[in-house]
Amino acid sequence: MYSSCSLLQRLVWFPFLALVATQLLFIRNVSSLNLTNEYLHHKCLVSEGKYKPGSKYEYILNDYIRFLAAGNFRSGSMHMTSGLKPNAVTILYQCSGDSYNSKCRSCYAAGISGLRRRCPRNKGGIIWFDQCFVEITSISVIDFNISKINYENNFPLHNPNRVSGNIKSFNNETMALLKELALKANNKDNMDNGKMALYASGEKRVGTKKVYAMVQCMRDLVKPKMCKECLESIIKEFPECCDGKQGGRILGTSCDFRYELYPFLRTSDSKTV
């Protein structure tokens, strides 16, 4: 079960005994024992208002949705933005680095369906799943700022169960792993489809157990320098988000991280380093 200040999410977790060790191992592929595409959270951007049935906004929105759905989802991220208010439309999605291609397509479809159900006729909304997030907004192409990190929509989730043993050491070791992955994600040698991957995953042995983790930035909008800044910022929130928790994550639209005490990434289509 995940929980936050205002949200409880049902997920299956494995018990963990936290022990201190120093061995750090980065892996290219992590097998998955608990592979899901669970709904995690959504946010209706009510300040953007609603659109009317049959309106020009609805026509543009549906046209963009179909256009993105016809793509190959090979890069794992995409955005489209066009027009001026009141009919400006922007759609973007980002899939997890291990869920590109067909898995990304399926998650995008789930995101669009979920937004229509949870934020009916809202001009703006964001929805997160295990494998992706999808955002729709009425921000115009002129106002859509791709050079600014968005922290407003960050949302923490964590396992309510705490690790046993030395909590301080567990926190320090897990944060060290996340920081190392942030550096890997921004390494110029970490390329994918001709662009910096801005994604990394790895595992860290702690006694007889392992902590598995990943970090990622929105590839289609976030520049490498911004990615580093974004990841550093949310990792600093670890003590408030995930202090001594058996698992946790911070969702966002510019960057995110996740750690668990079990493998949670796919072996195929993996972008791990």
Curated annotation (Swiss-Prot):
Which keywords describe this protein according to UniProt? Repeat, Secreted, Signal
Q: Give the family from UniProt.
A: Belongs to the cysteine-rich repeat secretory protein family.
Q: Which InterPro entries match?
A: CRR_secretory_protein, GNK2, GNK2_sf
* UniProt signal peptide: 1-32
Query: Is Kinase among the key words of this record?
Result: no
One of the Pfam families matching this protein, by short name: Stress-antifung
GO cellular component entries: extracellular region
The name on file for this protein is Cysteine-rich repeat secretory protein 30
Task: Report the PROSITE patterns cross-referenced here.
Answer: GNK2 (PS51473)
Recorded hits in CDD domains, A to Z, give: Gnk2-like
Q: Disulfide bonds, which pairs?
A: none
The record's listing under Gene3D superfamilies reads: Gnk2 domain, C-X8-C-X2-C motif (3.30.430.20)
Keyword Repeat in the entry? The reply is yes
Looking at the record, the residues that make up the Gnk2-homologous domain are 39-141, 151-264
Where does this protein reside within or beyond the cell?
A: Secreted
Q: Which organism is it from?
A: Arabidopsis thaliana (Mouse-ear cress)
Q: What is its main location?
A: secreted
